[in-house]
Amino acid sequence: MAFLRSMWGVLSALGRSGAAVCIGCGSRLRSPFSFVYLPKCFSSVLASCPKKPVSSYLRFSKEQLPIFKAENPDAKPTELIRRIAKLWRELPDSKKKIYQDAYRADWQVYKEKISRFKEQLTPSQITSLEKEIMDKHLKRKAMTKRKELTQLGKPKRPRSAYNVYVAEKFQEAKGDSPQEKLKTVKENWKNLSDSEKELYIRLAKEDEIRYHNEMKSWEEQMIEAGRKDLLRRTIKQRQKYGAEEY
């Protein structure tokens, strides 16, 4: 896992060049969840498994999002979500009940379908299916979360001194392939003196300050939008015990 985190850091610093590194390896570097083993023999079983219904709030959001986008074409995703969340909170219980009742009805249908579906499976198939569903759920949850955070404009994490150096030197580095270029940059970094590295250390510290300031602003927006679930754990704890947020 440490290796994967290290590679992600380098690729983030490279931007498009990082994608080239992956292409040179034959495929893009996957997220850690992509390496979860999924038994292929049950893929067709999972494909025919009934899908869970979406929540009442998600139904409302999906219904309202196109409307809000059409009315506010230049609005940021965070602003749209904030407005939809506000509208949902202010929605009368009688109107919320429409979405809640629709969800309950779909959930009942889902339970009946999943019950009939499991009756057709052997015990070993059920065990393997449950494992595959969990694995796919974790992978999908991670991908969805990452996509959502990108759409919501979550600030990019600060770069290390080494990643700052890679971003600056990669294009001009010697090598016929992206892998060779990266190897050259890595060796050059190792050969830098402490005084030469000082510049990149300073830039990395500045980037860390940038990240802290942007995260503070972003999390304030998420609190206003009713998305406290996206806050960092330390911020959640401070809010829970009534301490200052920062």
UniProtKB/Swiss-Prot annotation:
GO terms for cellular component: mitochondrial nucleoid. PANTHER family: HIGH MOBILITY GROUP PROTEIN DSP1 (PTHR48112), TRANSCRIPTION FACTOR A, MITOCHONDRIAL (PTHR48112:SF36). Keywords: Activator, DNA-binding, Mitochondrion, Mitochondrion nucleoid, Phosphoprotein, Repeat, Transcription, Transcription regulation, Transit peptide. Residues 1-42 form a transit peptide. One of its GO terms (biological process) is mitochondrial transcription. This is Transcription factor A, mitochondrial. Monomer; binds DNA as a monomer. Homodimer. Component of the mitochondrial transcription initiation complex, composed at least of TFB2M, TFAM and POLRMT. In this complex TFAM recruits POLRMT to the promoter whereas TFB2M induces structural changes in POLRMT to enable promoter opening and trapping of the DNA non-template strand. Upon metabolic stress, forms a complex composed of FOXO3, SIRT3, TFAM and POLRMT. Interacts with TFB1M and TFB2M. Interacts with CLPX; this enhances DNA-binding. The modification Phosphothreonine is found at T122. Transmembrane segments: none annotated.
